[in-house]
Amino acid sequence: SKQILILMTVILVIILGGCTYVLNKTSGQIYEQMSQMAQLYAQELDNRFLRISRNLFSTIMDTNETNSTFWGNVNLMKNGDYSEYAIGKLREEYFSSAWEYGTEYRIFLYTHDTDKLYQLSLSSDGNYTMSSDIAASIREQIDKLDEKTYAVKRKWDVLECDNEVYICKIAQKNGIALGCIVNVKSILEPFSKLSLGKHGYVSLVDQDEVCIGMLDQSGIISEPQSMNTKNTYTIRQGLSRAPFEIRIGISLGGVLSLMAGSLLGMTVLIFMILIMSGILLFHVYSNIMKPLKVFTQ
């Protein structure tokens, strides 16, 4: 019986060692997959930001304004009798942006002469409405920009309105401002279904290391808190087209949750191996060792 106990212990140690190796290998693969996912999403965001910036820049800085559809409609707006017609035409120009960028990216136009702001792209509700608070925040941001060519080259800025955080890109020329605004919630939303554990999070951090948006297991946090990096494995992925960085913190609970299938499979495997080993050893003891012991006595 002593030999059987030793043999069972050796088998158990070998099994546990193998399981530990598999778990470490699996957790490493999970971290690598999460890192690749963050990289792919950052590339998608960079591509989207680049296309939006190019559209704003090329449209507002069109040197041949006489042949520009955009400037033709903008100039038509100066005639009060045709302003509604001109806005309708501009909205037709940006109708496809809802599919190209997503309805969460809202294109807007602001005219200094009339102090009016119009949303040109379609919202998710099928309208062109923008809250007065957001419009006021955009006006304040436009006032901060100098009326110079380099203003269109500035990177995405952060706006706060009604406990919500937005990022905004604005290009302006000759008293006309053309821009795009998006809620940070929409940027973090694709990560909402990830299982990151109790202390896990996804955040958007600016170049000053300030967290401007955070998502944890409870959902989007309107007032981002300090990130718990002690109990998490942190993945950092910077954006090249905007001064922000995506950070993903995965806690031990999140890793175990993502490894649930592997853990369940290994538990069943260990249980089956132990049962089979026990049956085999009992058979060896009953049919070989016990008769041999009786014979030697």
Regions found by a protein language model. Name each.
Residues I87-T103, K173-I212, Q217:
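Solvent-exposed, extracytoplasmic
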Residues E32-I138:
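Extracytoplasmic/periplasmic sensory segments of membrane signal-transduction proteins
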Residues L120, Y128-R139, E160-L194, R247-S251:
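Conserved beta-strands of PAS-like sensory domains
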Residues K169-S186, K230-F271:
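Short, hydrophobic beta-strand elements of compact beta-sandwich sensory domains
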Residues F282-Q297:
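Membrane-proximal alpha-helical signal-transduction linkers
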